Amino acid sequence: MTIQKQKALIGYKKAQSLLKKIITMVEEDRYCIDIMQQNLAAIGLLKSAHQLLFEGHLNSCFKSALETNSPAKKQKMIDEILTVTKMATK
């Protein structure tokens, strides 16, 4: 596992723990602003993990694909990056 994936995994586990806390807060009918703050913290963790995976992918899989002689493989990687980027900016 790459260092980026290891760091992303830590972020995902932290987000998972935070989501459990948020669910408990909602079930306990806690103050809305407190819940929203925790929600934003979870979103931040997920965005950071996404960025780590994206950077790792560009520096490994994407880079390798661009170094091949296969135009189809190159185009497939470009299309995948465009798809993920569009999803991330929605």
Give residue spans per PLM region.
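Solvent-exposed interaction patches of small proteins and small membrane subunits
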Residues: 1-90
